[in-house]
């Protein structure tokens, strides 16, 4: 147990563990790890689809009672024990070593597909240095007499994404071939990650100033530009107008809790590793609150910037819809050009409907409502590589905005990769299983190369489908289980009193009633509720995916298919294999202790037998 004052044997003795150059490096590293692509492309979507401003109510409740308390535990225990995730849990109890191994496994799996998203971002970033942008027009067909039919049917941006970037197959069972342009981008991404993490926090601490701060500069630029675009106000009103009825839907509360959980990058082990390089007397309570609030405020800030541009896109699409209808009316009734303005269109259509009903009914008029176009948002890669990319096309100086947008996404993802790799590299180094004579730079290179080789499967034509599988199943359930084990391990095995003593020793202040109640009761209950909800959703909805199939009768809508049996087995393995470390290590430890006791008993019996014979 830590003492309230005086020397502590764990941390007061000078050791060789690296340390942050300054507090800002540490804060930026944690913020960079927490603030990732999900803040840009998932939170705005959830906020819009779950009642706008009403979604902020369950979101901030989850932040206060789930996110910040769990985050505080990770920072405090990492700083106190000065080890990575595996070392921390083995120190708390040898039976909990599987929690650290599970966190390590998930960090490894997530690193594989997260860096694949970065290779896509890099590909779009490199293609942004063209004018016009390559996704602004359809390519010519083989006869060069017209445009490619698939592009005309789906649209230029979707065609560039699905065909010219992914060259995706129409079924996951058809693996396809390696796409060499993506393979080269994967090489570049892993090389960049290696150069940044080559010396651990000594190297990432230098790069983090740029990778963590540059996205805020770009978001501010987009916000200023977006607010000056026509339709921006409508986009923001639509985003934040509260619909309190949505709070009656349990899915809203589940999505809010999971968004907080994954947005803070809890249970990956990266934050534990980062905190282990802190001075022992650092105020980790203040750090936890600051980083969590910055993460949430960034989500709100990004939502305003993103949806100001999305409002512009919706307004633009709405205007073009009206223009097509106006052109149809002008051609049908031989009206002079420009005789009908957008504002006059509703009244003109109403008049013609009343006087020329049959002729109007034969026209291919579309129903144009601004709200319908605002509804056409997306989350995940669909927002970044299709919806927002199309919006940028209509902005003056599209290439510049595209470079800024994908440059921002790359730095966001890169800073998150630092935390993922710390969750992989630090535990391996702390365990001492790697040869000590080999330089850290070489060991880091070997680990990055192993990750690179494992991620090559994502550069296949079916790689996009496999990335969705990894994103959906590799982390979700496992991290919830590990977070629950973290709370139980620290509060009930390490001990609440002992943990509070440690915090008092580190910060000079004992945790108050809020912290103790959330750690002991509220956070575990929320995590258990999320776990049960996930299990119910998995049972109710068989795993399926949406395939890009030009032969599908409703193309360009994607064809929904169920995963083949062997893929469903893979989904189950990804969902539960990392978690099996927990009972596996506990059982191995139990057998080891039983074996030792058995040997000790037999040795003692043998000695007594020899003594009796000697007598």
UniProtKB/Swiss-Prot annotation:
SUPFAM superfamilies recorded: SNF-like
Effect of residue 158 to D: No effect on protein abundance. No effect on cell surface localization. No effect on alanine uptake activity
Entry-listed glycosylation sites: 143, 167, 353
Side of membrane Extracellular, spans: 48-52, 127-177, 228-255, 310-397, 463-472, 542-570
Impact upon substituting residue 213 to W: No effect on protein abundance. No effect on cell surface localization. Decreases alanine uptake activity
Residues on Cytoplasmic side: 1-26, 74-105, 199-206, 277-288, 419-441, 494-520, 592-615
Transmembrane segments: 27-47, 53-73, 106-126, 178-198, 207-227, 256-276, 289-309, 398-418, 442-462, 473-493, 521-541, 571-591
GO biological process, any: renal amino acid absorption
UniProt-reported outcome of changing residue 297 to S: No effect on protein abundance. No effect on cell surface localization. No effect on alanine uptake activity
Principal localisation: membrane
Effect the entry attributes to changing residue 568 to R: No effect on protein abundance. No effect on cell surface localization. No effect on alanine uptake activity
Documented effect of changing residue 502 to N: Decreases protein abundance. Strong decreases of cell surface localization. Strong decreases on alanine uptake activity
Tissue-specificity statement: Expressed predominantly in kidney.
One GO location term (cellular component): plasma membrane
Membrane topology: Multi-pass membrane protein
PANTHER family for this protein: INACTIVE SODIUM-DEPENDENT NEUTRAL AMINO ACID TRANSPORTER B(0)AT3 (PTHR11616:SF109), SODIUM/CHLORIDE DEPENDENT TRANSPORTER (PTHR11616)
Role, per record: Symporter that transports one amino acid molecule together with two sodium and one chloride ions in kidneys and plays a role in the neutral amino acids reabsorption. Preferentially transports neutral amino acids such as L-glycine and L-alanine but also other neutral amino acids. Required CLTRN for cell surface expression and for its amino acid transporter activity. The transport mechanism is pH-independent.
Protein name: Sodium-dependent neutral amino acid transporter B(0)AT3
Native organism: Mus musculus
Lineage of origin: Eukaryota, Metazoa, Chordata, Craniata, Vertebrata
Underlying gene: Slc6a18
């Amino acid at each position: 147990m830590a003492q309230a004052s005086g020397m502590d044997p764990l941390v007061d003795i000078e050791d060789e563990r690296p340390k942050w150059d300054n507090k800002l490096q540490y804060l930026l590293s944690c913020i960079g790890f927490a603030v990732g692509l999900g803040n840009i492309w998932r939170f705005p979507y959830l906020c819009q689809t779950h009642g706008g401003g009403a979604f902020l109510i369950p979101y901030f409740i989850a932040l206060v009672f789930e996110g910040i308390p769990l985050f505080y535990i990770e920072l405090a225990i990492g700083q106190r024990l000065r080890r990575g995730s595996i070392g921390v849990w083995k120190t708390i109890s040898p039976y909990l070593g599987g929690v650290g191994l599970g966190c390590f496994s998930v960090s490894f799996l997530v690193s594989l597909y997260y860096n694949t998203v970065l290779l896509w971002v890099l590909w779009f970033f490199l293609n942004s240095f063209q004018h016009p942008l390559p996704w602004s027009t359809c390519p010519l067909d083989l006869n060069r007499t017209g445009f490619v039919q698939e592009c005309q049917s789906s649209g230029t941006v979707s065609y560039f994404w699905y065909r010219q970037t992914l060259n995706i197959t129409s079924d996951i069972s058809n693996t396809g071939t390696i796409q060499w342009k993506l393979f080269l981008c994967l090489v570049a991404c892993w090389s960049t990650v290696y150069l940044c993490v080559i010396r651990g926090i000594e190297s990432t601490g230098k790069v983090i100033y740029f990778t963590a701060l540059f996205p805020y500069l770009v978001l501010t630029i987009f916000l200023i530009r977006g607010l000056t675009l026509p339709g921006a106000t409508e986009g923001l009103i639509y985003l934040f107008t509260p619909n309190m009825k949505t709070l009656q839907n349990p899915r809203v509360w589940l999505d809010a809790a999971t968004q907080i959980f994954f947005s803070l990058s809890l249970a990956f082990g990266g934050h534990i590793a980062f905190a282990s390089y802190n001075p022992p007397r650092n105020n980790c309570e203040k750090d936890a609150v600051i980083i969590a609030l910055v993460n949430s405020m960034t989500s709100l800030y990004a939502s305003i910037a993103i949806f100001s541009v999305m409002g512009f896109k919706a307004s633009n699409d709405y205007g073009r819809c009206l223009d097509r209808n106006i052109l149809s009316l002008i051609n049908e009734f031989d009206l002079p050009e420009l005789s009908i303005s957008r504002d006059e269109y509703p009244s003109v259509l109403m008049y013609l409907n009343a006087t020329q009903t049959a002729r109007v009914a034969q026209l291919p008029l579309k129903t144009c409502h601004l709200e319908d176009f605002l509804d056409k948002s997306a989350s995940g890669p669909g927002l970044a590589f299709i919806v927002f990319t199309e919006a940028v096309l209509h902005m003056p100086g599209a290439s510049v905005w595209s470079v800024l947008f994908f440059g921002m996404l790359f730095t966001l993802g890169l800073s998150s990769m630092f935390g993922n790799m710390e969750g992989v590299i630090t535990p391996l180094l702390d365990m001492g299983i790697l040869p000590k004579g080999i330089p850290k730079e070489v060991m880091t290179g070997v680990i990055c190369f192993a990750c690179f080789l494992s991620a090559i499967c994502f550069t296949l034509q079916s790689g996009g489908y496999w990335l969705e599988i990894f994103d959906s199943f590799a982390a979700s359930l496992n991290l919830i289980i590990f977070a629950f084990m973290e709370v139980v391990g620290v509060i009930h095995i390490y001990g609440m009193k002992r943990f509070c003593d440690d915090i008092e020793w580190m910060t000079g202040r004992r945790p108050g009633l809020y912290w103790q109640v959330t750690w002991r009761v509220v956070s575990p209950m929320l995590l258990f509720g999320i776990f049960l909800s996930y299990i119910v959703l998995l049972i109710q909805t068989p795993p399926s995916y949406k395939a890009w199939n030009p032969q599908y009768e409703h193309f360009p809508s994607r064809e929904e298919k169920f995963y083949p049996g062997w893929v469903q087995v893979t989904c189950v393995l990804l969902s539960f294999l990392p978690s099996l470390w927990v009972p596996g290590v506990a059982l191995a430890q139990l057998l080891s202790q039983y074996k030792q006791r058995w040997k000790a008993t037999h040795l003692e019996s043998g000695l007594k037998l020899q003594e009796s014979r000697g007598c």
